Structures are given as structure tokens and as C-alpha cells.
Amino acid sequence: MIRTAHDQQRPGVRNPFLGLFNFIAKVYVTVIRGTPMMVQLLIWSSVVFLSSRSYTMIGILGLGINSGAYVAEIIRGGLMAVDGGQMEAGRSLGLNYMDTMRFIVIPQAIKAILPALGNEFIILLKDTSLITVIGGKELLYAAQGIMGRTYEAMFPLIGVACVYLVMVMIFTWLLGKLERRLRQSDRR
């Protein structure tokens, strides 16, 4: 939202605080999107939280920070995609900036970004398997435990793949229902 507000400022009318926050947001997005998630997780577990042994929580934090950068850009793109005339229309109706964003711009942006947000959530869901690398306990970690006891790799890994596939299929189905429901509101 900060980046969108900064990008939509009129020339000559600049808010210095918005400029500072925009710079911080740009650095955050650039650094996080420009480095592999595996490296980020290793930095979180081996450098930042060196003394902590709660690897699952470190993994969740790392995944959240990584996904946040992508979600921020998805939201920014969705807000920028809404025609500027919508903001002017809201203002001409007497709505202030916040009400115009809340009642006019954001509902349109949500419809535009829903597929991309769904894809980001699916990627995040599948990336949870990377937590195993730093010692976090999750689905792949459990499969590795089974493989260590049974010396069988194929069935535990296929089982994990099937569980992830079912979770993704359920989420995709729910997302499709939500998209259809939002499309119905367009027809009214």
C-alpha cells in the first residue's frame, strides 16, 4: 500500500515519510525476491537465530517473510491495475481517500489479484518442505524418519507427494468457488 500511495502521488506533492517507507519497502522486496528461499532459511537459522532450537518456528518466520515480499508486489500490482478514474469517481461522490480505497478500489483489486494470491499460497504450501533443511519438523521430515527406519524411499516420498497434491487440489477448488462467487457479484 505504501509503494502504491507513493507511486500515485502527484508530481511536486511529495511526502518525505512516504518516500522513506517506499525506499524500505523496495529494499525489502528486492532483497527477498532476489535471493533463494533456501539461502534465506539458512540465514535465519544459522545467523539470525543461531541460539534458538525452534527450527519449525524459524522456518515459519522465514517462509512468511519471503512470501510477504511476493504478496506485497501482487497487491501493489492489483491496486495499480485499477483505473485511476475509479479514485476520481469516488472523490467526486464525496468519499475521502480511505473510503474510496475501501469501497471502490480495493474490492476491484481483490478480484484482480485473487488468482495470483492463490498461486502464491500454493507455492508457500509446497515450500514448507524446505523447513526440513534447517531441521524443522513437517511432512517431509516425517517421511525421512520413515525412510530411515524402513530403508524404503519410494512409498514415503510418494505418500508425501500425494498429501501435498490433495492439499493443493482442495485449496484450488476452494479458490475456484470464491472466484465464481465474486464473478456472480459482477453480474448484479
Task: Annotate each language-model stretch with its function.
Residues M1-R188:
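Transmembrane alpha-helices and adjacent helix-loop boundaries
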